[in-house]
């Protein structure tokens, strides 16, 4: 994943493990609670980290999550390339917010968290351009909530990014490294 590569590329040593919480259930409960959608990534990052800390109580555990908000609606990952095309048509020529959060837990509590918001505008895309893009990316694009990967072929369809580039990749890296340097 891009988060894994990001953290490895800055020289961090760590192990990864899947969160033990049901992410979809956590998300559903959060949405039903009618809390501000923009706080969902911070909530999910914390829940993921806390679910892992149970098995690794003496380690620092880092959880992270990213969401996209477009026209005040949460955007979910596409399940197939047909859905990816619809999503790119919807986002074409328009701006959306990418919100990424990181939570650091130790023992049974969160000791630090951060959340960043970046704004991305996609180029105006026609069907042919979208089809060509999806043909190049293949199904791997389905792992990206916006159906583009800024660190790979995404610049072909991204018009502009306002805010932290690493946040667009799914991790508020500068804030995290600042936390680590103070710890």
What label would you give each PLM region?
Residues 63:
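Generic enzyme active-site microenvironment
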Residues 66-96, 122-124:
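Active-site-adjacent loop/tail segments of enzyme domains
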Residues 69, 103-106, 123, 159-160:
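Short beta-strand-to-turn element immediately C-terminal to the catalytic PLP-Schiff-base lysine
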Residues 1-12, 84, 94, 117-183:
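GST superfamily/GST-like fold recognition
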Residues 85-91, 100-118:
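Anionic-ligand binding region
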Residues 25-27, 67-69, 109-116, 161:
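Acidic/polar active-site rim loop that often engages polyanionic ligands
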Residues 1-60, 73-74, 128, 132, ...:
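N-terminal polybasic phosphate/anion-binding patch
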Residues 66-68, 98-105, 148:
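Short beta-strand scaffold segments in enzyme catalytic cores
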């Amino acid at each position: 994943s891009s988060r894994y590569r990001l953290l490895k590329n800055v020289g961090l040593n760590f192990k990864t493990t899947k969160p033990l919480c049901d992410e979809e259930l956590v998300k559903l409960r959060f949405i039903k609670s009618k809390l501000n959608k923009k706080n969902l990534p911070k909530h999910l990052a914390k829940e993921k980290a806390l679910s892992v800390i149970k098995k690794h109580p003496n380690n620092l555990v880092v959880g992270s999550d990213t969401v996209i908000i477009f026209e005040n609606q949460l955007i979910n990952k596409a399940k197939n390339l047909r859905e990816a095309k619809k999503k790119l048509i919807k986002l074409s020529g328009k701006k959306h917010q990418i919100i990424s959060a990181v939570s650091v837990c130790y023992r049974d509590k969160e000791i630090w968290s951060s959340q960043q918001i970046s704004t991305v505008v996609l180029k105006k895309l026609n069907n042919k351009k979208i089809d060509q893009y999806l043909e190049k990316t293949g199904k791997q694009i389905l792992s990206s909530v916006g159906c583009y990967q800024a660190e790979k072929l995404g610049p072909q369809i991204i018009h502009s990014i306002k805010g932290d580039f690493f946040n667009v990749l799914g991790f508020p890296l500068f804030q995290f490294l600042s936390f680590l340097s103070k710890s």
